[in-house]
Amino acid sequence: MNILFFYRVYPNYGGVEVVTTVLANRFIKDGHGVIIASIEQPHIELACQLLPDVKLVKLDYPVCSIKNMRKLHRLIINEKIDIIINQWGLPFMSTLLCRVAKRTSCKLISVLHGAPNTSKLIIKARDKCETVYNPFLKYIYHAIMYLKEELVKASIRYNCSHCEKYVLLSSH
């Protein structure tokens, strides 16, 4: 089986990155092919933690560009990818990009690392609401927070409805 991981920032420091490294190496040891595609590769020196057979592929911003879609589609076809594991499972953009697999036999699994009812985006918006004292600004920041909460909900709904499996990894 050939597996492609997709994540925004890899290789990098962090929990999702460690999980991706461990899984990629395990899949290689089990005889599978593994590619990790990412938009940013800030700590390429961490690639030494991967077994030599794991391939790294760099994509570019904007995430959903035609260039990225074509590159990912070519990878799926040329490398005979069976499964994409989308490790960046919250923003709808990642699932939208990975939907290039829709025109192939490749299956898409999206993973949400964290609580489904919040995100960094919402936490920052809540912090802003709590630290402002001006009533007008407080109203504006609450409206912005509401819109961000709705965006996160819509992203999760989109992701759940456009992949074969949606995995939630959360302690909440």
Model-derived regions: residue spans:
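Structural alpha-helical scaffold elements that stabilize or flank donor/cofactor-binding regions
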Residues: 75-77, 158-159
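N-terminal strand-loop element at the rim of the active site
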Residues: 5-13, 19-20, 26-64, 172
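Generic beta-sheet signal
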Residues: 59, 111-113, 169
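A short, charged, and often flexible helix/loop element on the N-terminal side
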Residues: 52-74, 86-90, 137-145
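Proline-aspartate-enriched helix->loop->beta-strand connector
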Residues: 80-82
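Membrane-proximal helix-turn-helix segments that form the acceptor-binding/catalytic region
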Residues: 70, 130-166
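Short His-centered aromatic/hydrophobic patch
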Residues: 86-93, 112-115
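A short helix->loop->beta-strand "cap" motif at the edges of active sites that frequently abuts
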Residues: 104-108, 163-164
